[in-house]
Each structure stands twice: as C-alpha cells, then as structure tokens.
C-alpha cells in the first residue's frame, strides 16, 4: 500500500505532496504533539497530527515517505499508509476498546478484594496473618503489570527516545505506589501504637496497592469509554464511506455481463445497476428508468426519478428499475468520494484554540514532574513525614491529564462532521466556524439558490418586422455556444440552432456572434441598447416580465434591438420558511444578484427578504460583501454559481449549494447538498453547536488542569480519588462531544 498523496504546486514551482500516514501508539495529546514537532523539524515539511483520528497530514517538498516514517518511528510510534475511507472497514478504536475491556474486567475483579484487604491491613495491623503481604502482592501483580501494560509499554518507549507523555505520568504513578507498598510490606518497621479509629486511619501504614490498582482501573475505564465514544463518533463517517459499492457488473461490447471490483471500473465503460444495488460511479443513464435513493449524498429520503440522459451519482441506491449507466467519473473522482474527503479534511484542520492546547500539552508532562517534585520537597521541608510527602507527589502525578486538552476540539469536530454528513451538510474546516456566533447578516444569490435554477422561456416579444420565431432562432444560435443557465433555457426553446461564428462572451453582460451574416447580440437590456434607442414595445415587455420576477434579455440584430425574451424561474418551496427561520434567529437577510432590480424585488417579496441589491457583476458582489464587513457586519454568503465564487471566498462564512459549480464549492466553508434551503439555518445551527461544544470542552480542560494540580499539591486529594478524577475528565470531554450526534433529531426535515 502506498501513502495517500495529493499533488500541489507552490509559488516556487516546487512539487508539494500531501501525505497522510496513520500513526499507531498515540494515547494522549502529548504523543500527537511530539510527533507533530518531530515532523515539522524536517526541512520542507509542514505537518499536522490529529490525536482523535490518529492521522498525520504532511505537506512535504522533496521528502521521501520512508524518511517521514522513520522520524515517526524514532519518536516511538508506528506509521503506515493512511487507509482510504472509501474502502476502510476496520475500526481501530473499537479494537482498542475491546483490548482495554479485557484488561479492565480482570483489573476490576481483582481490585475489589485488593482494596478491601489493603485498607484493612494498613489501618488495623492486628488483622494481619502470616503471608498477608504475599496475598496482597499476588492480587496486585496482574493489575499493575498486565492490566497496566499499555501505559508501561508507551512509557518505556518514551524513555528509550528521552521523551515523556501522559503514559509516563500514569506508569510512574503506578510503579511508585507499587514500589512504596512493597517497601512498606516487606521492610521491617517499628510497630506503632494508636488508640481510636481516626488515629488508626491517620497514622496507618503506607500501603498504596489499592492506589496503584485503583488508578489502573479508573484510567483503563476512562480510556475504554473514550475509545468506545471515539468509535461511535466516527461511525457516521464509516457508514458514509461504507455506502460505496464493492463490485460492479460491466457490460461488454458483445452484450455479456462481467462482474469486476468497483476499483477497476474505467471512465466511459457501461455498467448495470439493479434494484437494491448501489451505483458504483458518477455517470449518465444510457438505458432504463428507475427511482433512486439520494439520501447518501443529500441526506434527504425523497426518491429521484432517473431516465435516459439523466445524471446519477455514485454511492446512491436504485430502489426500483434497471439502469445501464456510462461512467463519467470513477474512484476518487466521484462526487461521493469528494464528499467523504471533505469530512476527513475537516478533521485534519485545527482551530486556533487547539493550537494553543497542543503547545501547552507539549510542555505539560515535564512541568508535572517538576511540580510534583517541588510539592514533595516542600512538604518534607515543612516537617511532613516521607509517607505524607510521597502521597502528595503521587496525587500530582496521577491527577495531571493533558488528554482533555488534546481531545477537546478533534472529538467535537469528528462528531459534527459525521452528523453533518448525515444531514447533507459538509464542513470543510474550522476557519469560518470560529466566527459563526458573530454572524449577523446572511446574503443570498438568486438563481439556483433561492430559485430552482430550471429556467424556461415564458414569452418572446418581437418588433421591427421580425417575428418571434425568427428572434428566438437567432438568439438560440448564439446562446448554443454559452454555458449560462439563461442560454440553456433559450436553446431548449428552439431545438435546432443554426451555426454561429465569431462567438464572444461578455462577463455579466451577454454574448454576441454572427449568424447567417447577421451580427446578433443577446444580453442585459441596458447592454444591448447602450448605443441605440429602445423600442417602446420591448421596454413594455421588459417591465411586464420583470414585474412577474422573470429575467428579460434583449436581442439585437445588426445593431438594432428587435426582440425581448422573458425567462421564468420558480422560487423554491423551502425558501420562504428558510428566510423566516433566519429572521427568527435575529439575522438580517439580503438578496444579492446580477439580475435586474424589478425581478430581484419580485423574488425577494415572495420569500420575505427586505434588502435587495441587484444588477451586480461578480466583482461588484465582492465589493458589496467587503463593504458589509467594513461596516462591522459578520457575513454569511449562500450561492451556487461561478459568479458566486469570489463572494463566497470573501464572506466570513461561505455556504455553497452542493449542485453548484466547482468554483462555488471550492470557495465555500460549508457545502449543502440538499436542494432545500431549509438546510441553511440547520447548517448555521450545527456550526454554532459545534463551536459551543468546543468552548465547553476547552473551558473544562483548562479549568480542570488549572484547579486539580494545585489541589493535589496542597495534599487535599487522595491519590485514588485523583485517578478517578483524571479518568472522568477525559470521559466528560468525549461524552460532551457525542451530544452533537443527536443534533437536529427534533427538527423537521425539509
């Protein structure tokens, strides 16, 4: 298996490879931070290591994959090529959880009698019998050795490379408590005389077997629930990836059918899909009709009808009917694979607050050893007994836990990404999510966003001796060379376009060309008539069409305006409810479009938008967004077309409708694959909920460590309680993140 690579090029024309490696053996945030630091020391390497997903994402220039693996292995970990999600079926978190559960069960069963006997023999020495020390040692040995081996193994590996991690703290605490207990049991001491139960407790022998075993049990329990929760958090993504077909039936030229692995399907090959089967690749229907379940892509259970010439998406399921499809995109080039990559890439990125947490975790473990040593020395200097000072040191070592810092952001993002994918919302990264709470203005494009984008010619008006059919024929001939949605509607209205020469497209204005020796222009009325007066009949047709919310283009032949073509679109049923939902959240909505003022206002009135900014060229849309930001507004932009790309990139939060152009999708921060606009407020709510969860996690993580270590240093925490608190801390963070998996369950799907 080769490493997962993505080629790119920087400004110096040097080849940049994106390499993803799975890193095994990382059990805490300090582990991930150390691997990241080691990788970033390599010249030409920029690396990010995600503790939650155990994936190192590396942008490298002139660096071999083997060199990267060697550096990771020298840091004490194992590196393998990242398994592509589309074929990944193994859940490492579930396997790790099962391993921990076996150790936890054995440790818990032995811990109960060990804790009871250890406490009794320490407080009431008269109850001791011959061989009592060997009994305690026999009960403790499996716990502090085999059950705690995952911690000891990592600690030994760290020591080999002169490093330290959370496991170093745990292992040191367990071994120290065990060693001190063995010394107390097997080294002769002066008998003590105590009177009363409290004196017996306060002056009991320092037998810390129950602490060593208890810390092992609590930490194993915490790690088990953490691993199980992380497995559940990633289940949505694994379920998404598992929807891909494993095999495909290819139609051979002689009509025979051949079953091959899905990965071997090539573009332009014809393949067969039967009821209940998953479509293997993106393609065009050649033969047959069927109903398709698009929920894998859109999150909506609404079936879609497919017939010859229909486009279909890989990863969706045929409910009934039989289809023969010509593959247009296969493997990693399909829309389904791209969506899975979006979810993965979102988990690779780090929020600003997580970068701070990583820097703290990197120096945290050495600091804990220093603090523990200073705390123990202070107690000794204050006249405390060695037993008391050791108890304080042990408490500090056990309670310190940088794991919460490392889990706070990645687990929340993992759950949110998976849940978002189920809802048809794909989060591309943290950049915009960090400003989501400040969003106060939502800007909408019109065509394809608020409307269906399925344009059709409603009326054709002619003048100057031209008939409507001739005007439409000339317009269709020129527009046949254009890809604009208006052009598509005009061409569809006249099925037999004539040949065109000297075609030229004028961005934001219109097109021109030569048809049958006539110079024909089609476009905005103001552009077509800028050098010639407009006929009263055409102007009347324009006003009437725009009053209905239609787009009207003028046609001129040899410099004389001779026709007006009205293009109708349908407002989405979900638009009004979506705008109402946004307004109820206190957000201001704006319609920003390149269409004319009258048509834009007609649509805005239907959906409930008060502010309309029309007749905007693509670059002018960017200026509008920037002006809003300069006025202190935090802006979200919703769009789908090529002309929306710059505005989406300029906005604080860009939301692209998933059926939009690659330019729009590439510039956006959130991708909404449903046609329904009802997903817009849901997407904003999910983003807000994600950032709220991250903030709660970070407050807990920082607050826990800031408060716990001083309390332990002051001697107010028993080491056993400290171990339980440390395990609960990580469990709380992961469980809090898991609440996002229920997001939207109470909301009505559009």
From Swiss-Prot:
<dbReference type="InterPro" id="IPR000579">
    <property type="entry name" value="Cation-trans_P-type_ATPase_A/B"/>
</dbReference>
<dbReference type="GO" id="GO:0055070">
    <property type="term" value="P:copper ion homeostasis"/>
</dbReference>
<keyword id="KW-1133">Transmembrane helix</keyword>
<feature type="domain" description="HMA">
    <location>
        <begin position="17"/>
        <end position="80"/>
    </location>
</feature>
<feature type="binding site">
    <location>
        <position position="31"/>
    </location>
    <ligand>
        <name>a metal cation</name>
    </ligand>
</feature>
<dbReference type="GO" id="GO:0005507">
    <property type="term" value="F:copper ion binding"/>
</dbReference>
<keyword id="KW-0460">Magnesium</keyword>
<keyword id="KW-0067">ATP-binding</keyword>
<protein>
    <recommendedName>
        <fullName>Cation-transporting P-type ATPase B</fullName>
        <ecNumber>7.2.2.-</ecNumber>
    </recommendedName>
</protein>
<dbReference type="InterPro" id="IPR036163">
    <property type="entry name" value="HMA_dom_sf"/>
</dbReference>
<keyword id="KW-0472">Membrane</keyword>
<keyword id="KW-0547">Nucleotide-binding</keyword>
<keyword id="KW-0812">Transmembrane</keyword>
<dbReference type="Pfam" id="PF00122">
    <property type="entry name" value="E1-E2_ATPase"/>
</dbReference>
<dbReference type="InterPro" id="IPR044492">
    <property type="entry name" value="P_typ_ATPase_HD_dom"/>
</dbReference>
<dbReference type="GO" id="GO:0016887">
    <property type="term" value="F:ATP hydrolysis activity"/>
</dbReference>
<dbReference type="InterPro" id="IPR027256">
    <property type="entry name" value="P-typ_ATPase_IB"/>
</dbReference>
<dbReference type="InterPro" id="IPR001757">
    <property type="entry name" value="P_typ_ATPase"/>
</dbReference>
<dbReference type="InterPro" id="IPR008250">
    <property type="entry name" value="ATPase_P-typ_transduc_dom_A_sf"/>
</dbReference>
<dbReference type="Pfam" id="PF00403">
    <property type="entry name" value="HMA"/>
</dbReference>
<feature type="transmembrane region" description="Helical">
    <location>
        <begin position="360"/>
        <end position="380"/>
    </location>
</feature>
<feature type="transmembrane region" description="Helical">
    <location>
        <begin position="715"/>
        <end position="735"/>
    </location>
</feature>
<keyword id="KW-0597">Phosphoprotein</keyword>
<feature type="transmembrane region" description="Helical">
    <location>
        <begin position="389"/>
        <end position="409"/>
    </location>
</feature>
<keyword id="KW-1003">Cell membrane</keyword>
<feature type="transmembrane region" description="Helical">
    <location>
        <begin position="200"/>
        <end position="220"/>
    </location>
</feature>
<dbReference type="InterPro" id="IPR023298">
    <property type="entry name" value="ATPase_P-typ_TM_dom_sf"/>
</dbReference>
<dbReference type="InterPro" id="IPR023299">
    <property type="entry name" value="ATPase_P-typ_cyto_dom_N"/>
</dbReference>
<feature type="transmembrane region" description="Helical">
    <location>
        <begin position="129"/>
        <end position="149"/>
    </location>
</feature>
<feature type="transmembrane region" description="Helical">
    <location>
        <begin position="547"/>
        <end position="567"/>
    </location>
</feature>
<feature type="transmembrane region" description="Helical">
    <location>
        <begin position="693"/>
        <end position="713"/>
    </location>
</feature>
<feature type="binding site">
    <location>
        <position position="28"/>
    </location>
    <ligand>
        <name>a metal cation</name>
    </ligand>
</feature>
<keyword id="KW-0479">Metal-binding</keyword>
<dbReference type="GO" id="GO:0005524">
    <property type="term" value="F:ATP binding"/>
</dbReference>
<feature type="transmembrane region" description="Helical">
    <location>
        <begin position="663"/>
        <end position="683"/>
    </location>
</feature>
<dbReference type="InterPro" id="IPR023214">
    <property type="entry name" value="HAD_sf"/>
</dbReference>
<dbReference type="Pfam" id="PF00702">
    <property type="entry name" value="Hydrolase"/>
</dbReference>
<feature type="transmembrane region" description="Helical">
    <location>
        <begin position="471"/>
        <end position="491"/>
    </location>
</feature>
<dbReference type="GO" id="GO:0043682">
    <property type="term" value="F:P-type divalent copper transporter activity"/>
</dbReference>
<feature type="active site" description="4-aspartylphosphate intermediate">
    <location>
        <position position="445"/>
    </location>
</feature>
<dbReference type="InterPro" id="IPR018303">
    <property type="entry name" value="ATPase_P-typ_P_site"/>
</dbReference>
<feature type="transmembrane region" description="Helical">
    <location>
        <begin position="500"/>
        <end position="520"/>
    </location>
</feature>
